[in-house]
A protein has these predicted regions:
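A short helix-breaking turn/cap at a secondary-structure junction
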Residues: 1-58, 228-239
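Glycine-rich, small-residue loops and helix-cap segments
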Residues: 4, 66, 122-239
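Predominant activation on well-ordered alpha-helical scaffold segments within soluble catalytic domains
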Residues: 4-8, 29, 61, 92, ...
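Glycine-rich beta-alpha junction loops
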Residues: 10, 45-48, 79-83, 156-158
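Acyltransferase
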Residues: 27-30, 52-78, 96-105, 127-148
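Short helix-loop capping/hinge segments that flank enzyme active sites or metal/cofactor-binding pockets
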Residues: 33-44, 85-142, 192-205
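Short glycine/threonine-rich loop-to-helix capping motif typified by GTGT followed
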Residues: 54-56, 83-93, 162-168
Length: 239
């Protein structure tokens, strides 16, 4: 519900923002209470379910059983996978003004700075090839949504890293973002909701994704799942 309230305040066309979409803004808060019994669910097992931690696999299967009860059908689907990434280029372009000035560049956390700088030397031809590839993938994902209304995937294949494991950030970041970054390429709305814990008490999430401008359906199923479970209300003891 918090995410719906936030998006309700943020959404809308802004002529000063080239990435802004000229489209009507739905009532996202009312969408939380939309019926989900007619939704067709697609489960993207290829790639997204590969190499899952055992606890994540078990918790995800339980979540899928609950989602099956909340919706009309659940079926496996294949998603197109982008073979190139433009992610390093666009963040660098956004931050370039600040990265070029020593006084503002020094404000960046070293690991963040290192990631941003990977986009500095990518040739324009490589970037254009990547953009064309993403256009192809985005068109293909549209055909998937002719068969299903929403997609389900695990949020991460691995449990949260320990402080020690976090000392090797490239590996940790790549693993933690493996299941989320493709949806950046698809350009579709996606939300992660808590669906359980590992045997050691570490949180596990499941992703719900919808078609372009399909936030209302995403909110509806996420809210229905949270009403059917209690994971989102559980908090660690701070004592």
């Amino acid at each position: 519900a918090d995410t719906a309230l936030m998006l309700q305040a943020l959404a809308g066309y802004d002529p000063g923002d080239l990435a802004s979409i000229r489209a009507d803004v739905p009532d996202y808060v009312s969408a939380l209470y939309r019926r989900t019994s007619e939704f067709r669910i697609g489960v993207a097992r290829s790639f997204f379910f590969e190499g899952l931690d055992e606890d994540i696999e078990e918790v995800t299967d339980r979540a899928l059983a609950i989602l099956s009860d909340l919706t009309a059908t659940v079926q496996d689907v294949e998603l197109p996978m982008p073979t190139v990434r433009v992610v390093p280029v666009e963040p660098y372009a956004y931050h370039a003004e600040y990265l070029e000035q020593q006084e503002t560049r020094a404000l960046y956390q070293p690991r963040v700075l290192s990631r941003l700088l990977t986009g500095a030397d990518i040739p324009a031809t490589t970037y254009l090839e990547a953009r064309n590839e993403l256009t192809r993938v985005q068109r293909e994902i549209e055909t998937v949504f002719s068969e299903v209304d929403l997609l389900i995937t695990p949020t991460s294949p691995l449990l949260p890293a320990t402080i020690e494991e976090g000392q090797n950030p490239p590996d940790v970041i790549a693993s933690s973002l493996r299941n989320t970054s493709p949806f950046d390429a698809y350009g579709i709305p996606t939300i992660s909701v808590p669906c359980g814990f590992s045997q050691d008490g570490l949180p596990i999430g499941i992703q719900i994704s919808g078609p372009h401008l399909g936030e209302s359906a995403v909110f509806a199923l996420a809210h229905a799942y949270e009403q059917a479970t209690d994971w989102h209300n559980q908090q660690p003891s701070l004592a």
